[in-house]
């Protein structure tokens, strides 16, 4: 792919925000200093190709995006700021219109004249559009000297690619898509945004955590599984793929999970619990684990309504926490999707305000920043959410053709869920796995819900009668010491 960067500028709030604004990063924010910038990729196909001709593209399309960005930053001014820390190592995000070192949002314009929208939508992995998304391999900690948001708008042969990199120490997915929808709203002609962000982080957790920022020798090192403690082992080749579960497929999976009435009178399984159980089970089968091997499921859960007192949906920042659970691989394989869904449901239900506070208290006593190594042995970890209305982000030239995550923050077993382009309750699943495991997964008719499903897939991990040596109920509860 031939890409030419045409310009790189910075965008600040159109009307300067008066005074120096400072917000201490909370215990919900700080662990993400060790992660990489959170990348998003949106692809738009233009109906009127004349909008791609110069000077129209620069003078109208690009300038409208930049003008809208400047206006929306008046409300989301933290994104135009920078990370800072005091002498004790307490981190904050700050914005000061008078500070010459605060440049605002980085905004680049690029051209890829020979690339079409279809060229990019047909690609499974992120390699094809990696150059279209800024800040590959950049740690959030670098927000001390870099902008907290970088945008790259690339003109294609028949459309526009928008790559974004958000500093994950400053905001989570809910805040990201609140910002994106607000920016798009302004670009479509609104005089003001419909929903204001709630900016006071201290209402969620009012603590001053002092951090010892000793960077790891290799911040890019990631591992997952038996070889995590053996640095001499060559890391496996990882591949990425999108699985698109149609409205019908999601309904089918949910119906199957709920076809068995739980003996403990638990609630019906949600779409999320049913689908992620389906994926967890089939990834475990494809990995060919031993029946007694433990497999961990991790979900980054929104805690806005879980904390006490609850925070508004518009809370700007990170208000997520990892929930860990797990079971023996054989137990997961020997049962239908209701088993994994029950394990997931119980873990999520148990993660109430008291558990959240206890996790935060524990972390504050002994904070560890650089933990981007392992989400748990043989894990499947879930980020993003299909409830984010990503296909409604319309800047005035139509809804996106596709929405993806970038190449950052991927490891063996990591998956991102997005609202399906097909509508309804369809869900697109991006997942990263070892190449050999992915090959088995794409051949599984049962996983893909093909007309002819594979039979007795679960026998691969059982001892013949559907049982394994478990600990009674097969659950492994997370202790909060893993991936966050």
From Swiss-Prot:
One of its GO terms (molecular function) is acyltransferase activity. Disruption phenotype: Smaller rosettes, collapsed or tangled trichomes, postgenital fusions between the rosette leaves and flower buds, fusions between sepals, altered cuticle permeability, loss of cuticular folding in petals, abnormal flower and silique development, altered seeds surface, defective mucilage extrusion and semisterility. Increased susceptibility to salinity, osmotic and water deprivation stresses. Its EC number is 2.3.1.-. It is found in: Cytoplasm, Cytosol. It holds the Pfam family Transferase. Disulfide bonds: none annotated. Residues 467-484 have a biased composition (Gly residues). Residues 211-233, 452-484 are annotated as: Disordered. Keywords: Acyltransferase, Cytoplasm, Transferase. Its main location: cytoplasm. The active site is at residues 168, 394. GO terms for biological process: cutin biosynthetic process; localization; plant epidermis morphogenesis; trichome morphogenesis. It comes from the Eukaryota. One of its GO terms (cellular component) is cytosol. PANTHER family: BAHD ACYLTRANSFERASE DCR, FAMILY REGULATORY PROTEIN, PUTATIVE (AFU_ORTHOLOGUE AFUA_3G14730)-RELATED. This is BAHD acyltransferase DCR. It comes from Arabidopsis thaliana (Mouse-ear cress). The gene is DCR.
């Amino acid at each position: 792919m031939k890409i030419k960067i045409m310009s790189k500028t910075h965008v600040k709030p159109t009307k300067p925000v008066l005074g120096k604004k400072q917000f201490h990063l909370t215990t919900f924010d700080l662990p993400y200093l060790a992660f990489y910038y959170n990348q998003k990729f949106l692809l738009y196909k233009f109906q009127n190709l004349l909008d791609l001709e110069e000077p129209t593209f620069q003078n109208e399309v690009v300038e409208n995006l930049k003008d809208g960005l400047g206006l929306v930053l008046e409300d989301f001014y933290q994104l135009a700021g920078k990370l800072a820390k005091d002498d004790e190592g307490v981190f904050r995000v700050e914005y000061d219109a008078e500070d010459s070192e605060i440049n605002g949002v980085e905004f680049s314009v690029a051209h890829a004249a020979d690339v079409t929208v279809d060229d990019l939508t047909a690609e499974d992995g992120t390699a094809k559009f990696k150059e279209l998304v800024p800040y590959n391999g950049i740690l959030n900690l670098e927000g001390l000297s870099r902008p907290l948001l970088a945008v790259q708008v690339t003109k294609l042969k028949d459309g526009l690619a928008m790559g974004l990199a958000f500093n994950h120490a400053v905001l989570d997915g809910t805040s990201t898509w609140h910002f994106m929808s607000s920016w798009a709203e302004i670009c479509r002609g609104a005089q003001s945004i419909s929903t204001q962000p709630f900016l006071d982080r201290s209402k969620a957790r009012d603590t001053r955590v002092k951090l010892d920022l000793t960077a790891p020798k290799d911040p890019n090192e990631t591992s997952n599984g038996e070889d995590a403690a053996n640095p001499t082992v060559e890391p496996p080749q990882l591949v990425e793929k999108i699985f698109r579960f149609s409205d019908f497929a999601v309904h089918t999976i949910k119906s199957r999970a709920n076809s068995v009435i739980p003996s403990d009178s638990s609630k019906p399984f949600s779409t999320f619990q049913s689908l992620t159980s389906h994926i967890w089970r089939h990834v475990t089968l494809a990995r060919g684990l031993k029946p007694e091997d433990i497999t961990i499921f991790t979900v980054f859960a929104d805690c806005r309504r879980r904390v006490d007192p609850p925070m508004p949906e518009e809370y700007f920042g990170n208000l997520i926490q990892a929930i860990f659970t797990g079971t023996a691989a054989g137990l997961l394989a020997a049962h239908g999707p209701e088993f994994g869904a029950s394990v997931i449901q119980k873990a999520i239900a148990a993660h109430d305000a008291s558990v959240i506070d206890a996790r935060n208290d524990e972390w504050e006593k002994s904070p560890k920043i650089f933990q981007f190594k392992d989400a748990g042995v043989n894990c499947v970890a879930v980020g993003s959410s299909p409830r984010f209305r990503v296909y409604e982000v319309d800047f005035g030239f139509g809804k996106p053709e596709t929405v993806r995550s970038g190449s950052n923050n991927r490891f063996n077993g990591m998956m991102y869920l997005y609202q399906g382009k097909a509508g309804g309750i369809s869900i697109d699943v991006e997942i990263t796995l070892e190449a050999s495991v992915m090959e088995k997964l794409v051949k599984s008719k049962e996983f893909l819900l093909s007309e002819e499903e594979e039979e007795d897939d679960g026998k691969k991990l059982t001892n013949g009668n559907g049982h394994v040596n478990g600990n009674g109920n097969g659950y492994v509860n997370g202790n909060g010491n893993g991936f966050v």
